[in-house]
C-alpha cells in the first residue's frame, strides 16, 4: 500500500495544483482511492480531483459529481443534513467503504523530540492548565482585558499553574500576561502547532475558544472547557471530561460566572 498525503495552500495557483496531480500520477500511477477531506466546495479542489483521475473518490460534503463514489451519499447526508461531528462522519464513511471499523476520534501523533523539548520546560510546573486565548478570527480571540479576567477567575478557583498557548500573533499578549501575573507561564521556544499540541497533550485541563486546539484536546483526551462564539455541532468537544460555554458572535461577551461554573465542573470530574 502506498499512501500519499499532502497539503495545498490556499494561495496555490491552478497550474501548481494541476502539476501536483500530474506528478502524483507520473510517480505512482493512477491512484486507487482519493480521500478528499476538505470542508469547502471550491474550484481548486475540483480541478485537483479531475486532474488526478483516481479510480474512486471519497468526500462527505455533499458533492454530487459522477467522479465521487455512490458510497459517499449517506456520509454526506450525515454531514450536510444531520450536521454530525466530522470524525463520526468519516468513521462511518470508511466503514461504508469496507475498511475495518475505526473509532470516531481525532489523532495527532507527535515526535519524541517535540514532546521532550516541551516537557523539559514544563516539568518543573507539575500539573498545569493550558489556556489558549486565540481563535481563527478577531471575533473569536479574547482581548487582553478579558484574558486578564479569565486568569483572575481561574486563579480564584484553583492554584494550578497556567500555561498560555499561543500562535505567532499572540506572543505579545502572552508575554504581557506572564509579566503581570504570578503562576502564569509560556513556552520560551518559538510557537508552533506541534509544540502547542505537546502542551495540550500533557495539560491537566485545556481552555480554548479555538476548534483546532479543541481537536488536540479531543485527540489526547485532555479535559477541556470549550468556549464557542458560535456553536457548531460538527466540532464538539470529544474528550471524556468536557464542558462547553456558548457565548454568541463575539467571544469577549463571555459570562465569567458561566465560565467559572464550567471550570468547576471539569475540575470536580477529573
PLM regions with names:
Residues 1-270:
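Catalytic machinery of carbohydrate-active enzymes
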Amino acid at each position: 500500500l502506498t499512501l500519499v498525503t499532502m497539503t495545498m495552500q490556499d494561495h496555490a495557483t491552478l497550474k501548481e495544483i494541476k502539476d501536483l496531480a500530474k506528478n502524483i500520477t507520473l510517480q505512482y500511477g493512477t491512484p486507487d482511492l482519493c480521500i478528499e477531506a476538505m470542508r469547502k466546495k471550491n474550484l481548486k479542489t475540483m480541478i485537483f480531483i479531475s486532474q488526478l483521475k483516481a479510480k474512486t473518490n471519497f468526500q462527505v460534503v455533499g458533492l454530487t459529481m459522477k467522479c465521487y463514489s455512490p458510497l459517499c451519499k449517506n456520509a454526506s447526508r450525515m454531514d450536510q443534513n444531520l450536521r454530525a461531528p466530522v470524525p463520526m462522519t468519516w468513521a462511518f464513511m470508511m466503514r461504508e467503504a469496507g475498511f475495518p471499523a475505526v473509532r470516531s476520534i481525532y489523532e495527532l501523533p507527535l515526535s519524541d523530540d517535540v514532546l521532550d523539548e516541551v516537557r523539559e520546560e514544563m516539568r518543573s510546573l507539575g500539573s498545569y492548565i493550558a489556556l489558549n486565548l486565540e481563535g481563527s478570527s478577531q471575533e473569536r480571540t479574547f482581548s487582553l482585558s478579558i484574558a486578564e479576567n479569565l486568569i483572575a477567575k481561574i486563579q480564584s478557583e484553583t492554584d494550578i499553574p497556567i500555561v498560555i498557548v499561543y500562535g505567532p500573533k499572540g506572543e505579545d499578549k502572552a508575554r504581557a500576561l506572564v509579566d503581570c501575573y504570578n503562576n502564569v507561564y509560556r513556552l520560551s521556544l518559538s510557537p508552533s502547532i506541534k509544540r502547542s499540541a505537546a502542551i495540550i497533550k500533557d495539560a491537566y485541563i485545556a481552555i480554548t475558544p479555538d476548534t483546532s486546539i479543541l481537536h488536540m484536546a479531543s485527540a489526547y483526551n485532555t479535559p477541556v472547557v470549550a468556549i464557542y462564539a458560535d456553536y457548531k455541532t460538527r466540532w464538539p468537544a470529544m474528550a471524556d471530561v468536557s464542558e462547553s460555554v456558548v457565548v454568541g458572535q463575539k467571544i469577549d461577551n463571555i459570562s465569567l460566572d458561566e465560565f467559572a461554573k464550567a471550570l468547576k465542573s471539569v475540575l470536580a470530574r477529573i
